[in-house]
Curated annotation (Swiss-Prot):
Similarity comment text for this entry: Belongs to the major facilitator (TC 2.A.1) superfamily. Organic cation transporter (TC 2.A.1.19) family.
Keyword Cytoplasm: no
GO biological process: monoatomic ion transport; xenobiotic detoxification by transmembrane export across the plasma membrane; xenobiotic transport
Keywords: Cell membrane, Ion transport, Membrane, Symport, Transmembrane, Transmembrane helix, Transport
Gene: Slc67a1
Lineage: superkingdom: Eukaryota
Segments passing through the bilayer: 16-36, 51-71, 117-137, 148-168, 176-196, 232-252, 264-284, 294-314, 316-336, 380-400
Topology in the lipid bilayer: Multi-pass membrane protein
Name assigned to this protein: Solute carrier family 22 member 18
Length: 412
């Protein structure tokens, strides 16, 4: 990683920029999960029924799905500083509208739906992944990306805890206002401390005077590269069944596991702690000892085993036994595929590639509630396990018959 980075207003060494990026990601994710913890209660307070709440969630997912690739291309062309600053400013706008929707004197339902609009530009995590990808050597990339799991775990645990505690003690608008202040601070830190670009000068010049940020042909060309499409399809197909289960988890925890709200919160905290441990500590070490394709196959295999367990489970204790395997598979699949995909494209396109990767989860959130709800109502929880088992056995068979080649140079 030779070459000089364009200066920021506050000079930081390369390692300092990476650490600050982790901090910014943790702050944004904490605010995001604070929002997730109050949205159901705010919706109920404003009189939304379950159908309207579903529309609200779908709107958020669709906007993030559409915005991810475009934001990634913007990050490649305009640099890390502009991308992170824009993401935090969009988040600030979302939380400000959320605060306004809590006021009885204002049209709350309209403002609540309007607060979803900035979600199209809220992509701090992909921007952070781009910074880390640009500033680390390819051999160290999986370990560096896996440390973002610690940030995610911090967001799940502290965001959910703060959201519930503050809304109970000071009102439902308090977490939203705190998130507004924190994301404004994140925008200031991004603008003053993050370099204009984290790409080297020779790489950044490839985008100067190039095509538009909204050039969908350039985005689709990247996705159709020979070493990109197979890995991306594995990422989408293998993770989709577990995504269906996670989308339906709030319903499953109430109906199937018979959990109270507090008990479901404890289970989510357990999930967050496991994710911190596995993604932050386990995956990084495994990536230094085993090839990425071996880790990818192992994640698909564990997905299949967990799917079998889900098909047979009958209570929450069984699910707790399956949870470490589920979290391992989710973490390994996401980290390994992100690393493989960024290595498969040129350094000038890493942001766009990570933006495409970031669209996978919103895709599940968009399609999942309808499909998952239909399967769950018709066949029960076991069908979600059977789908996960069969899909991942099929993916594993394809990977076994036709391995993903890791040879050759990056796409230029």
């Amino acid at each position: 990683m030779s070459g000089q980075l364009p200066s920021s207003m506050v000079a930081l060494p390369r390692q300092g920029i990476i650490i600050l990026t982790y901090v910014l990601a943790a702050l944004e994710l904490t605010c995001l999960f604070m929002q997730f913890s109050i949205i159901p209660y705010l919706s109920r307070t404003l009189g939304l029924d379950s159908v309207s709440f579903g529309y609200l969630q779908t709107t958020f997912g669709v906007l993030q799905l559409l915005g991810g690739p475009v934001f990634g291309r913007f990050a490649d062309q305009r640099g890390a500083r502009a991308a992170l600053t824009l993401s935090f400013l969009a988040a600030s706008a979302l939380y400000l509208l959320l605060v306004a929707s809590c006021s009885p004197a204002l049209p709350g339902v309209f403002l609540l739906f309007a607060s979803r609009l900035p979600a199209a530009l809220m992509h701090t995590l992909p921007a952070a992944q781009m910074v880390i990808t640009d500033l680390t050597a390819p051999t160290k990339r999986p370990t560096a990306l896996s440390r973002l799991g610690l940030c995610f775990g911090i967001g799940v645990i502290f965001g959910s805890l703060l959201g519930g505690t503050l809304s109970t003690a000071y009102g439902i608008q308090c977490p939203a206002f705190l998130a507004f202040v924190v994301t404004l601070l994140g925008a200031v830190l991004s603008f003053t401390c993050i370099p204009v670009t984290t790409k080297e000068a020779s790489v950044q010049s490839a985008h100067q005077g190039g095509t538009s940020v909204f050039d969908l042909k350039a985005i689709s060309r990247l996705l159709l590269l020979p070493r990109v499409l197979p890995v991306f399809l594995v990422k989408v197909i293998s993770g989709f069944p577990s995504g269906l289960f996670m989308v339906m988890f709030s319903i499953i925890s109430m109906d199937f596991f018979q959990l109270e709200a507090a008990q479901a919160g404890y289970l989510m905290s357990f999930f967050g702690i496991l994710q911190m441990m596995i993604q932050g500590l386990v995956i990084g070490r495994l990536s230094t000892r085993f090839p990425e394709e071996a880790l990818l196959r192992s994640s698909v295999l564990v997905f299949a085993v967990v799917g079998l367990g889900m098909a047979l489970m009958s209570n929450v204790f069984h699910f707790c036994l399956l949870l470490p395997g589920l979290v391992f598979s989710l973490c390994a699949l996401n980290i390994v595929t992100d690393s493989m995909l960024t290595k498969a494209v040129s350094a000038s396109d890493t942001g766009t590639m990570l933006g495409l990767c970031a669209s996978v989860h919103p895709l599940t959130r968009t399609v999942g509630p309808t499909l998952g709800g239909l399967l769950y109502r018709s066949y029960g929880v076991s069908i979600l396990g059977h789908v996960q088992l069969m899909v991942n056995l099929l993916v594993l068979l394809v990977l076994w018959k036709k391995p993903l080649s890791q040879k050759g140079d990056k796409a230029r």
